[in-house]
């Protein structure tokens, strides 16, 4: 969509102050769109002020709305008048305690129902685009493999759905809760496309591990995980190991490519709907460690354990078939993640041999 076509077009970004949401808000404002961004607390000046300062001179095209996942009706004012709605990922640690819901998954599914209804009632929404997670697209087989007990499909693709009935090494009850919320919310959203007369299209993008850079003042957890072999952070390195066991590889994508893909799906004409995996590279932890060891030979890089994992690649690139192109490969994602972490103080730039700033 040309910039002149974006003039007057209103889009809603839920979770606008988050890692992906803030980058997306900036990109949309730069392209000339009017953005309705939701925050859990518009009185939090650190977050609200950051969004207002993202693009100089664009403040008049940014409206901030207070909305809470556990009170889905609060999203209605932000959605009203918008032609496109971006449902950005739920915060990993969101706590349902004190709400009417038994779990985050229950709250998310209820919010999906409410938001879809609000989009219908708006009579303006043309497309809803959701940042899903590749963690809900595991190629693990339900049948046990005699040698290891764990097996994978030959490829990962959009037909893969994570089964919580399959055990795998390093499985975590905490991570299971996250998977369940992402799994159920994505399936609920996609089911809308199969209704009798849907009022708009739904697109979901199951994202790989999102890293690279941030406009926030701290390194996001996924960036911390991407640089874990360099920082030697065992907890963040543990997330890489869990993902590799779950997925048979470590899908990576740069946050800028994620937001380009989201905008691509919004601007796609005349129609786009359904599920599209979004990852630029599918390395193993061994590949990531090897890159860092080559880049920083003077450092003691945290290495992978000896457990064997099959390397599962994508069967196809459905986004690419539509015309989307990734700008960042594995090396660029990892290198920019290190630079980001060093800039924000999560890594010691002097030890890396980098200039901080």
UniProtKB/Swiss-Prot annotation:
It is an enzyme of class 1 (oxidoreductase). Activity is sensitive to heat, dependent on NADPH, and inhibited by p-hydroxymercuribenzoate and disulfiram. It comes from the Eukaryota. Keywords: NADP, Oxidoreductase, Plant defense. The keyword Oxidoreductase applies. InterPro entries: Epimerase_deHydtase, NAD(P)-bd_dom_sf, NAD(P)_dehydrat-like. Its EC number is 1.3.1.-. Changing residue 194 to G: In strain: cv. B73. GO terms for biological process: defense response to fungus; toxin catabolic process. NADP(+) binds at residues 40, 47, 68-69, 88-90, 178, 182, 207-210, 222. GO terms for molecular function: aldo-keto reductase (NADPH) activity; oxidoreductase activity. The active site is at 182 (proton donor). Belongs to the NAD(P)-dependent epimerase/dehydratase family. In tandem with Hm2, NADPH-dependent Helminthosporium carbonum (HC) toxin reductase (HCTR), which inactivates HC toxin, a cyclic tetrapeptide produced by the fungus Cochliobolus carbonum to permit infection and acting as an inhibitor of host histone deacetylases (HDACs), thus conferring resistance against C.carbonum race 1 in resistant cultivars (e.g. cv. B73 and cv. Wisconsin 22). Catalyzes the production of 8-hydroxy derivative of HC-toxin via the reduction of the 8-keto group of 2-amino-9,10-epoxy-8-oxo-decanoic acid, an amino acid of the HC-toxin. Plants susceptible (e.g. cv. Pr, cv. K41, cv. K44 and cv. K61) to the fungus Cochliobolus carbonum race 1 contain a transposon insertion (Drone) in Hm1 and a deletion in Hm2 due to a loss of resistance. However, the compatible cultivar Missouri 21A (cv. MO21A) possesses other defects in Hm1 and Hm2 alleles coming from different mutational events. This is NADPH HC-toxin reductase 1. It comes from Zea mays (Maize). The lineage of its organism: Eukaryota, Viridiplantae, Streptophyta, Embryophyta, Tracheophyta.
